[in-house]
């Protein structure tokens, strides 16, 4: 896709999201409406970013037990980050150093948290947090933020899918990310193909698989290989794109 077509699509998607926000009935929201809201916010953030020497974008999605919002806890925050090649070998974590290039390049603990853009955060009032909970309630997500205690297999590998509500959100974000890649929006923004990493602090198997699905042309292969090398996911857990 040409840069001009990519940017035109970028603008059209942004307008769809803004229209959805304006027309949405308060307290009730469908998956399609919430997806449009997420997409609109993601495009707004991308539009704000300067093109530098970025090598990857990260969609950081992490359930936070510390915050309570509208009576719920352990619901996911969503922030957008990027990292530049010029930052490699410059430790951005004041508490500990990376054990190697893989960790410094891909572990979110070594990405600059001075450069975070919120998509969903839980500081009241927050329209995106309200929309997330309205969507959960409208679609009947049960025990929002709760999680089963039976989440390890016989080899003590974590096989859970995160707290209730996270799989549903991750599915939408994966769909949006895949569309950004296949429609050429990321390439049009940065002038080159970049991986979009879906991540949490724990490098969970389901986040790694979501990243593989969201980057259908192998954009995130270097990240996937790093996760395999470090045992964050095994080959039998990894779901490859066909």
PLM-predicted stretches and their roles:
Residues 86-162:
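Low-complexity, serine/threonine/proline-enriched polar segments
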Residues 29, 38, 81, 85, ...:
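Leucine-rich tandem repeat or coiled-coil scaffolds
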Residues 25-61:
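Short N-terminal edge-element motif at the start of the domain
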Residues 11-28:
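Bacterial Sec-dependent signal peptides at the C-terminal "C-region" and cleavage site
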Residues 50-94:
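N-terminal interaction modules that seed assembly of large macromolecular complexes
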Residues 1-10:
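Bacterial N-terminal signal peptides that target proteins for export
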Residues 169, 175-242:
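Glycine-rich, aromatic-bearing surface loops/beta-hairpins
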Residues 29-43, 159-180:
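Well-ordered, non-membrane alpha-helical segments in soluble/globular domains
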């Amino acid at each position: 896709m040409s840069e001009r077509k990519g940017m035109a699509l970028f603008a059209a998607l942004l307008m769809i999201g803004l229209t959805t926000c304006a027309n949405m009935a308060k307290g009730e929201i469908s998956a399609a409406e919430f997806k449009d809201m997420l997409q609109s916010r993601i495009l707004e953030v991308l539009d704000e970013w300067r093109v530098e020497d970025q090598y990857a974008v990260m969609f950081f999605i992490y359930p936070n037990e510390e915050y309570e919002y509208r009576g719920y806890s352990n619901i996911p925050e969503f922030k957008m980050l990027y990292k530049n090649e010029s930052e490699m070998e410059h430790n951005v974590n004041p508490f500990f150093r990376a054990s190697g290039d893989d960790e410094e390049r891909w572990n979110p603990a070594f990405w600059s948290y001075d450069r975070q853009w919120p998509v969903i955060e839980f500081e009241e009032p927050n329209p995106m947090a309200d929309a997330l909970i309205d969507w959960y309630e409208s679609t009947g997500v049960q025990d929002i933020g709760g999680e089963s205690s039976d989440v390890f297999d016989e080899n003590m590998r974590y096989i859970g899918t995160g707290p209730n509500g996270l799989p549903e959100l991750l599915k939408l974000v994966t769909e949006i990310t895949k569309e950004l890649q296949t429609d050429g929006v990321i390439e049009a923004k940065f002038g080159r193909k970049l991986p979009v990493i879906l991540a949490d602090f724990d490098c969970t198997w389901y986040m790694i698989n979501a990243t593989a699905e969201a980057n259908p042309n192998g954009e995130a292969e270097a990240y996937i290989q790093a996760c395999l090398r470090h045992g964050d996911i095994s080959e039998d857990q990894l779901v490859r794109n066909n």
